[in-house]
């Protein structure tokens, strides 16, 4: 239902946000 869709969207957003934060704060080989 709609609640599940919202839950999935929130989960994806949280995962993306966590990934961005981790990428920003972890040393990147350049």
Swiss-Prot record:
This protein's UniProt keywords: Amphibian defense peptide, Antibiotic, Antimicrobial, Secreted
Disulphide connectivity of cysteines: none
Organism: Physalaemus nattereri
Keyword Metal-binding applies: no
Protein name: Nattererin-2
GO biological process, one term: defense response to bacterium
Protein's cellular compartments: Secreted
Lineage of source species: Eukaryota, Metazoa, Chordata, Craniata, Vertebrata
Superkingdom per UniProt: Eukaryota
Tissue-specific expression: Expressed by the skin glands.
Protein's job: Probably has antibacterial activity.
One cellular component term from this protein's GO annotations in UniProt: extracellular region
